[in-house]
Amino acid sequence: MSDGPIAPPKPAVVAEAHEVDTFHVPKAFFDKHPSGPHLKNLDEYKKLYEESIRSPDVFWARKARELLTFDKDFQTTRIGSLENGDVAWFPEGRLNASFNCVDRHAIKNPNKVAIIYEADEPNEGRTITYGELLREVSRVAWVLKQRGVKKGDTVAIYLPMIPEAIIAFLACSRIGAVHSVVFAGFSSDSLRDRVLDAGSKVVITTDEGKRGGKVIGTKRIVDEGLKQCPDVSTVLVYKRTGAEVPWTEGRDIWWHEEVEKYPAYIAPDSVNSEDPLFLLYTSGSTGKPKGVMHTTAGYLLGAAMTGKYVFDIHDDDRYFCGGDVGWITGHTYVVYAPLLLGCSTVVFESTPAYPDFSRYWDVIEKHKVTQFYVAPTALRLLKRAGDHHIHHKMEHLRVLGSVGEPIAAEVWKWYFEKVGKEEAHICDTYWQTETGSNVITPLAGVTPTKPGSASLPFFGIEPAIIDPVSGEEISGNDVEGVLAFKQPWPSMARTVWGAHKRYMDTYLNVYKGYYFTGDGAGRDHEGYYWIRGRVDDVVNVSGHRLSTAEIEAALIEHPMVAEAAVVGIADELTGQAVNAFVSLKEGNETNDQVRKDLILQVRKSIGPFAAPKAVFVVDDLPKTRSGKIMRRILRKILSGEEDSLGDISTLSDPSVVERIIATVHASRGK
């Protein structure tokens, strides 16, 4: 006899794991493979992963010696801890990044193609061999040295996607200088802030850039930004279009004229494993961009390891990452991973829609690309454009990667079926500027995948799901919380340039003894990870992390604005879109021109990619009695969740919520 009604089964916490199929590695992946993946199967991954967590010092020492060439070997694998924020890897070792990326391949096979340059206009590109790359890198290194750049100095790079960007990276690292790349879509103000923060005395740029058929006045932007940077003594200018540009005698020098003065070889300077390799500025929740600092050996090892095992790179491969060198994706997977592993890397100057929506597929077919890595934003755009643009076989493609944000299941399936012809393995990767390389990801040829999930942790990565309320780790499967990591790994950022306390407070002091990602995540019933997105005040637009505080600061600079609040909401094309709420100072009236001016203000202050998609002018913002703006309420209103705003009685003026809802409805024509 029953003891009473049987309780209904408890719904799954990570419900989407039960709504998708699991995809095994396509048989065609192995059929078209020249030699087979680096790992035999999932069991081999599990065995190596277990070793990387239980015996990290043994594991990483072996892999470092296997994948990198050290001038002086190390005795210690790792010192320091997450708790103290003083982690260091291979501390006695010495090496050079440029040697590891160029010389060792140039010595073995100087005629092998290192860079496949796909220019903005189709058929205007060129290839550069490893031998040629060594000569070009050496000459630019000489130029930098003659202009007074010493080991440890920072060099700002403001270049579009041209081979000279890679050459500039490697020329800096060849002489032990620290490259600080500023995305060539950033405004003159953003460039100025980054040059000043890094203390760069040399800036490398072009006369102009070309992208999607449009010309970008890079030198003009640099000149404007440097008006308030008196310490910059050299601007090295590569002639991309031949346009006439303003010139400051004594400071500005032409790349093509300078490189002719110097020899085609300069010996690489040996640096310590922990010497800085580069700074990369990322948006922080406080608004002030932070210069994330990566060091040499650990970062290079992370790039080489993930290139080898995630993307299954072999030295005859032709690897195409669609990311820009102004972001971490371009650093790690356009430049360092492919060149460390000695394959050919595609440098793509254009856009996926220029001159038409078949551009990516044309490039893949033309260059017999074997691995392709791009953001879901581009995939959504191309899916929407229609499958008739995909008219190539692209039969060499083995791996299709996704980066920057979670990829929706329907886009994943389209990528697999239409682009990969059900023959390529999809790798939906999760990582950050601060992690340096992929941290949760499938391994090509090895990991069964689920559309929408980043799959399983990479070697050395021990994820923890943390309860944000109690701060305690949640064990077991089918759980959700915030994502943290329990162990250090070689490619993690070491500090924020000139602000170690900020580094500690952002990543290591939130949950003591853990690295805090700032992202929410679920671990499903089979241990697969599903990334939920930011839990702090950062908006992810087209894979670019933007600080809401930084955008708010730009809006408040406008003389009419009293207060501003910025939130990110879901957007079909860009993943998230920036929406801004502003209240105006007394005496100012709302009109369309004000909204246009505010969007322009953000474009000028930060860059076009940060511009709000919508600006709502309201009489006040929802604030607590202590004055804190409740962005959560604004997010819910924009998402149509007005019936689940929660308790608004704690607001200093609860009636403001109804007025904001009315403004949003009126703007949307409801």
From Swiss-Prot:
Keyword Nucleotide-binding: yes
Binding-site residues for ATP, renumbered to this chain: G404, E405, P406, D428, T429, Y430, W431, Q432, T433, D519, R534, R545
Binding-site residues for CoA, renumbered to this chain: R211, G212, G213, K214, T329, S542, R603
One GO term describing the cellular component: cytosol
Catalytic activity: acetate + ATP + CoA = acetyl-CoA + AMP + diphosphate
Induction: By acetate.
The protein's name: Acetyl-coenzyme A synthetase
UniProt source species: Emericella nidulans (strain FGSC A4 / ATCC 38163 / CBS 112.46 / NRRL 194 / M139) (Aspergillus nidulans)
